[in-house]
């Protein structure tokens, strides 16, 4: 595990329908993340937060697209710099649209080393594009974008994007996926472990299979963790909550086994909304899950 970490916050909520998730990075930091990571022996560099444009162009099918593109371009540059210095980029959102920038940067950096795989833990598929979306919210498009099936503007920053191979992509904990979106995911060939399959197989089996798929002939894995994957009773502070999600223990098992694989190259933690939270319960959980993904074990 890389012992040098760059923590990059992104104060972004223009990709979502509800405001407040822009304060997610502050909530996760307030939960003690930086000191706890230092206590684990990491060399932690807090790179501050990326700020979005306050105004920008929009459309019915890609709401606030100018702000989304601008933020992702800035994040792409920051993650690229982090990787060039040999550090682990840890990105704190912010809504999930920011994953387009972080994943694009990591994929580009490892393009000549086999590329990367992606494990996407989320209640939603995020596999829409401007033609399939029902809402126009761009936090529902980044997974498809980084694989070349979504809006190219989310990942094209003046050079050819390094798209992720769908054979190395896994979606876990989905339980609110649009019919068109589900059809597109099936056609693309992405591996999906919906919540009912986790119930049937158990999280250890699911995450081990996900690691095998994402790391097959790749340099390693990017983890994109949307806190709405966790059941709202445990993580109430998120804007698109869906009931009957992952338990806290299932969530920790997933990230602990990923840490033990020594395949993790980079990570996003997104969609923590402190406005909707209860005494920073969700921010604290997000911080603890990050620590477990980086090697801490919850007994």
Name these PLM-found stretches.
Residues 1, 110-113, 136, 158-165, ...:
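Solvent-exposed alpha-helices and their adjacent loops that cap or buttress functional pockets
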Residues 2-12, 18-90, 102, 108-113, ...:
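Catalytic cores of soluble, metal-dependent hydrolases
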Residues 12, 95-96, 123, 174-175, ...:
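Active-site metal-binding loops of divalent metal-dependent hydrolases
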Residues 88-157, 261:
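Active-site histidine-anchored catalytic micro-motif
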Residues 120-123, 147, 168, 173-176, ...:
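Short, structured patches in soluble enzyme cores that scaffold and shape functional sites
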Residues 123, 127, 139-142, 165, ...:
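Internal, well-ordered alpha-helical segments in soluble enzyme and binding-protein domains
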Residues 128, 177-179, 274-276:
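Active-site environment of divalent metal-dependent phosphoester hydrolases
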Residues 155-182:
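Phosphate/diphosphate-binding glycine-rich loops and adjacent basic-rich segments that engage nucleotide
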């Amino acid at each position: 595990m890389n012992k040098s970490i760059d923590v990059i916050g992104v104060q972004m909520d223009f990709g979502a329908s509800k405001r407040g998730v822009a304060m997610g990075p502050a909530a996760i930091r307030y939960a003690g993340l930086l000191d706890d990571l230092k206590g684990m022996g990491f060399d932690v560099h807090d790179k501050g937060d990326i700020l979005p444009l306050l105004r920008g162009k929009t459309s019915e099918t890609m709401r606030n697209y100018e702000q989304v593109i601008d933020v992702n371009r800035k994040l792409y540059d920051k993650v690229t710099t982090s990787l060039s210095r040999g550090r682990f980029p840890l990105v704190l959102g912010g809504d999930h649209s920011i994953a387009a920038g972080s994943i694009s940067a990591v994929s580009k950096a490892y393009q000549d080393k086999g590329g990367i795989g992606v494990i996407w833990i989320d209640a939603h598929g995020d596999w829409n594009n401007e033609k399939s979306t029902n809402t126009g919210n761009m936090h529902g498009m980044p997974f498809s974008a980084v694989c070349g099936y979504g809006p190219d503007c989310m990942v094209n920053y003046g050079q050819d994007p390094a798209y992720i191979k769908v054979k190395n992509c896994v979606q876990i904990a989905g339980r609110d996926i649009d019919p068109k979106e589900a059809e597109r995911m099936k056609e693309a060939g992405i591996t999906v472990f919906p919540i009912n399959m986790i119930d049937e197989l158990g999280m250890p089996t699911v995450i081990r299979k996900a690691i095998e798929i994402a790391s097959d002939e790749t340099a390693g894995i990017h983890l994109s963790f949307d806190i709405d994957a966790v059941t709202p009773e445990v993580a109430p502070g998120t804007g698109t909550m869906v009931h009957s999600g992952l338990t806290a223990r299932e969530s920790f098992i997933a990230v602990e086994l990923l840490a033990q694989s020594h395949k993790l190259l980079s990570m996003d933690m997104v969609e923590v909304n402190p406005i909707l939270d209860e005494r920073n319960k969700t921010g604290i959980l997000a911080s603890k899950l990050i620590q477990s993904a980086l090697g801490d074990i919850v007994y």
